[in-house]
Amino acid sequence: MNNIGSSPNKIKCHIWAPNGSSCHTFYINIDEHTEWLEHPLRANGVDIVGIPIIFTSDVGYTTQNDINNTDTIPLHVASDLSIVGYPLGLSVNEHLPIWKNGVIASEPDVKISGLDYFYIDATTKEGMSGSPVFSHEYTTQIIVSPEVHALYQRRQRGELDALQFISSIPPESLNNTIQVKKFKLIGIYSGRVTVGTSMPDIGIVWKLSLIEEMLSSKNLVKSEYPPY
């Protein structure tokens, strides 16, 4: 937490019941006894931590694998993205986050100061540090008719080879399409860039690879700087 201008002493969390019937709120206190995971390059400036949470059987949670959020979305300068968090503490019905949009402002594959992060152009506010950042784009999907689905099942059972399957699909069925927005978790937002005394509305996003490295390193440390 070196060189950080503010330090929270409590984190408010919302967890839904497994059936979605209710939302449970709890707090994680941050003090000199708190332990968290740090990235091995924390001393070099990698500004992310992971706080272990033990879930009981009466709460539900969803992982990236559960929702199959593995779509391949190419990242480029000016690619659209969303930062999902609580700007100035604002929320919907006391627990749902706000989605703020922005664009990638630097080459996403080029390291900055030797570290895996990139800049975004977005109007972010206090309370959004630690927010997940998603890229997104629209893709075209074909709405499959029952007849085509039946052909697909026959192909799965080995009753049709690939050529027979393709030639059996009515051409007009390929015209029934829909636009679907796909999302991909690409990193964690950690704050805004300051140039002298000015703030150019440029934010920092640490890449997902750093989060994976932090979790695999299992570098568990205690809070070196108690909140103030």
Regions found by a protein language model. Name each.
Residues 1-3:
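Short amphipathic, basic-aromatic surface patches that mediate peripheral association
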